[in-house]
Amino acid sequence: MKWGLLVAIFTFSACNNTEEIENGGTNSKSKVTIDITESNYEDINTHTRAHVGETNLENLPELTQISDCSVATDVESDTAKDERAATRAITTPTHYKVRVYQGSTKVGELSGVLAGNSFTPDAGTSNQLDLKRNTTYTFVCFNEDVDSNGDNLEVVLAKAATARIGRSTFTTSGDGSTAMIKIVAKHAGARVRTKIMAYKHIVKPFKATFSSNTPDIPTKVSFNPLTNSYTTLSSAAFVAEENNSPLSTEAKFTGSGYGGYPGFTSCGPWHYVLPGTNVHHFQMDITEGQVYWKNIAGNIPKLAISDYIVAANGTYSARVPMKPVYTYLFSDGTTGSLAANPNKHAVAVVVDADQRLAAAIEEAGNGAKYVWQAAKYGYRHTAAKIVAGNWMPYSDYTFTNGESGYDNTWDASTSSSIVEGNKVRGENPDFPAFYAAAHFTPSVGVTGSLVGKKWFLPSELDYFYAVVTLGFTEKAELKGLYKAYSMYGLLFERAFKEAGGKPFLNDEDTKHFWTSTAFNGGGKVDLYGIATDFNSQYPDYEYKVRAFIKY
């Protein structure tokens, strides 16, 4: 077989770093071009299970609870679209070595600086390679952030972000025709970040750290160019790095389908690791941040629920979905979360802890519908206080002019002079909606401090407290009567459903509930999946009733 002398002369086009090699035999002459490009990080799924989409994160098992959040973790090969090309030309001066192997034997090496349209070989080194025709070779390139140890290439953790190694096999032609050898220099390390995911917009940026929970994070790896594999040489604990993340940028309310899935995100910075690193062995410590009601501070002990090993050039997000942890009133009069009280029975959801106000998880009368007042009163005002039907900010008709549903139900002075019989409307059958709320009893019964407590028909103000707390309606909104208030309606519903209660949004017919506010007749609240509004209705209409309680 005739040997050819391949003389390496690096030339470059606008988008490639190409080494043009002239094959100068006695009777023939051909060219072989080596094309070296650098790769961006890739979506490399090293896990066998299927990817968990946003809408299915709901089913992940709870890992821990921090403040008012139920936390799970899940790793994904990062699917964020990178607008850059998958590979790019080397435009800044970068030192590379190219080794050529025939089988397990190194038969040549080139070394120099690539930049723009030029290749400058290292002083005292050759720019020529002797290669056989019609022979298969393995080409390996690596930059100066990779250390050579014999044939093996070593990378330390400190260089995980910048070290690059490329590998390609190529068979030379037998007829001297021109061919292209493409080598893609890939990251020898991988990158990992945290992605906090919430069911509503994030209201306070996160301050946190990223560290390991074990001392077995690879700190040095060896790459075998012949087997194309990495081996861990040493391990240690991963020193804590800053992991702060910003407010979410998704549109309020719609960004999560009004609380239906964790669509609001706060991504931390990238942390660079070596191949073979297990994301299961990382943790996050949060000192500040807020999604729901409270500041979040605590430890997330592992960023993957099970082993998840990263690969070289991979990019990964440790997703941290956070659900709200609601506060419930239990049948014995105590309050707390469901997880902390597994043997207790919830009877109501706390909607304002300062006022000790809670809404029953069940409907009065098992979902029966009631009129606001008896037909004999017609459309005459039976309440001592009437909310006018003019436009006004919510602060005027709720806080300034608002009243307590407890008073409306149990205080005789809230009834007008035309009320016949008992002026306490909660005890007067002429006011079926009031009467149903006042005589509501949870199906599990009550004990302890709840014995003797009175349930009542909530006012519009009481309902407003509920939608602010459970649906995260913003108090800063200034809207008039009949105007809808945006809310995370599915988070509002979740509070009742998680405790086994009856949701408000059962169907189109049952989204309307009576309030005790007399607004040009009977006042009602309309609860939608995306919003709520407060308005009036003729008192002989029939709607459902949800009882509230002061515990």
Predicted segments with their positions:
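Sec-type signal peptide cleavage vicinity
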Residues: F12-Y326, A346, G378-S416
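Active-site-proximal beta-strand/loop segments in catalytic clefts of secreted hydrolases
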Residues: T37-S39, A359-A364, P458-Y463, S516-A518
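Residues that flank catalytic or metal-binding motifs in active/ligand-binding sites
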Residues: T94, A188-A190, A353-Q355, K453, ...
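An exposed tryptophan-centered "aromatic clamp" motif
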Residues: D430-K454, E460-G529, K550
